[in-house]
């Protein structure tokens, strides 16, 4: 079974996405900010096959930061360079999408259509 690391600071969004991914047959490990995402990944790196990270959440200093997900992306890629990563955002920001992909993300996904996220993950994992 595929294991997904899901990191989002909004509890309701985290729960909704987690339920969607569980129903789709994935194992899901959750975290709520950059430090917990990094630590959770470090403890489970061998089994995590893809990460889904919120773009805007508390950064490593605990303060909310626009683009903090890109910082976490960089940290995860240091630990596992070939890790596929999807960056989530509530905002359809083309420039941030380009930043995410340039920073090593596999894709960028605008929150709100959970089933679309499942389809995107399936597509990425199939290569």
Q: Predicted segments — roles?
A:
Residues 42-46, 75-83, 103:
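Conserved phosphotransfer cores of two-component systems
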Residues 8-9, 54:
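Acidic di-acidic motifs
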Residues 63-67, 71, 78, 91-108:
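Alpha4 helix (beta4-alpha4-beta5 surface) of REC/receiver domains from two-component response regulators
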Residues 30-54, 60:
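Acidic, metal-coordinating helix/loop segments flanking the phosphotransfer/catalytic sites
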Residues 11-30:
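Two-component/phosphorelay signaling modules centered on CheY-like receiver
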Residues 51, 85, 108-109:
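Two-component signal transduction core modules
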Residues 95, 112-123:
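C-terminal output helix
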């Amino acid at each position: 079974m595929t294991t997904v690391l899901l990191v989002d600071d909004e509890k309701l969004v985290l729960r909704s996405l987690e339920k969607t991914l569980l129903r789709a047959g994935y194992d899901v490990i959750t975290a709520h900010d950059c430090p917990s995402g990094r630590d959770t990944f470090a403890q489970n790196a061998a089994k995590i096959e893809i990460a889904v990270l919120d773009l805007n959440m508390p950064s490593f200093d605990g303060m909310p930061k626009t683009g903090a997900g890109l910082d976490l992306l960089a940290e995860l890629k240091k630990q596992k360079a070939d890790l596929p990563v999807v960056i989530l955002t509530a905002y359809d920001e083309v420039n941030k999408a380009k930043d995410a992909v340039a920073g090593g993300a596999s894709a960028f996904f605008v929150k709100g259509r959970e089933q679309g996220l499942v389809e995107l993950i399936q597509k990425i994992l199939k290569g």
